[in-house]
Amino acid sequence: MIQTKEDLRLYLEKDKQALGITRKRPCLVGDDIWKFEIALRYHEYLTNVNGGGVTRLIRRKFWGFLHHYFGIRLGFSIPINVFDYGLRINHYGTIVVNTKARIGKWCDIHACVNIGESLDKKAPCLGDNCWIGPGAKLFGGITIGNGVMIGAGSVVNKSFTENNITIVGVPARKIKDTGDPY
């Protein structure tokens, strides 16, 4: 969670790095995914930090509006305080994430992904360096290890706590060890 201005700067820089962007600020036209991530991070920061009075309230409402606006425009339903830094959203398109989900650093997510809770009201927890392919569905109180690659169209409804593996299928199953990329 973003608690300080230093955290906010770190998150913004790492998100920009994950998107492969070298410019200082977004273009007036385009860069909508980057603009969404900036609005998401400012909204997180202003929601998590107490104090500031009316000015902070107005700023929080403004960034909350931008977060919501870009989310609707791009098809994203990504709540605050779910993703750690290094979020990379690859394409416009439907991405739905439950507010209870927790996703680690350097997550790479594609279009048409759904990360939701199950009937028992538990949501997924993903480790760092995860890659989630287009159309993947993750639900329930599952835990996914670090460096896991989830194939396109996979349905993940059980935990995979091993690190650096590839899982695919309906329901998902491990197909290989990918090795540590670092």
Walk through the language-model features, giving the residues of each.
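Terminal amphipathic alpha-helical/low-complexity segments used for targeting or macromolecular assembly
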Residues: M1-L74, D180-Y182
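Charged/polar, low-hydrophobicity segments characteristic of intrinsically disordered regions
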Residues: R73-N81
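Left-handed beta-helix
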Residues: I80, Y85-G86, N90-T99, G104-K105, ...
